[in-house]
């Protein structure tokens, strides 16, 4: 009876170790934009394996792909670093689980300072983005500052970008009055 039990145990061990699952690697942490939708995460596919995904923190919601090697996630609006926000455990054909693979996710929520309205001759105003370190672009933007005289009269959309994320602000430059010369009666 002991021999039969040992044979069964040995068979299970051989099947599990013979169909080993292997850990995957990725860049950690991952950076996503606040309110991003359809963000795809995947591991190398082993055709006979199944995959159990868990998404926690960052307002993340697993949308599609549970059980497969690829999922899509919609992220929330609250910025911050979320340790172990995405986890996957691969199980082989013998239903033996592999090592959990964990991914930290940094949700990046950009904002820009509201400025203006301006008059056509107003001085240059620095543009401030949060978090710092991004780049401002748009009509009238020079070296992360807005120059009303360069932009001219009009309505403008300025964009702040960092790590693939963007936010915009609207800026208005108004025409100043045109006053005629001083005259004497």
For the regions a language model picked out, list residue spans one by one:
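Bacterial Sec-dependent N-terminal signal peptides
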Residues: 1-26
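Proline- and Ser/Thr-rich low-complexity, intrinsically disordered segments
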Residues: 23-49, 54-185
């Amino acid at each position: 009876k002991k021999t039969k039990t040992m044979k069964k145990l040995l068979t299970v061990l051989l099947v599990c170790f013979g169909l080993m699952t292997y850990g995957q690697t990725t860049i950690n942490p991952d950076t996503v934009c606040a309110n991003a939708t359809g963000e795809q995460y995947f591991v190398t596919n082993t055709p006979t394996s199944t995959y159990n995904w868990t998404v926690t923190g960052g307002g993340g919601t697993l949308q599609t792909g549970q059980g497969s090697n690829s999922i899509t996630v919609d992220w929330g609006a609250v910025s911050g670093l979320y340790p172990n926000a995405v986890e996957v455990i691969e199980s082989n054909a013998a239903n033996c689980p592999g090592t959990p693979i964990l991914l930290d996710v940094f949700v990046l929520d950009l904002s820009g300072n509201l400025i203006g309205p301006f008059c056509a001759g107003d001085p240059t105003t620095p543009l401030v983005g949060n978090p710092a370190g991004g780049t401002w672009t748009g009509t009238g933007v020079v070296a992360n500052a807005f120059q009303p005289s360069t932009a001219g009269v009009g309505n403008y959309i300025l964009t702040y970008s960092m790590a693939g994320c963007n936010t915009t602000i609207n800026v208005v430059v108004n025409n100043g009055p045109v006053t005629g010369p001083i005259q004497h009666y």
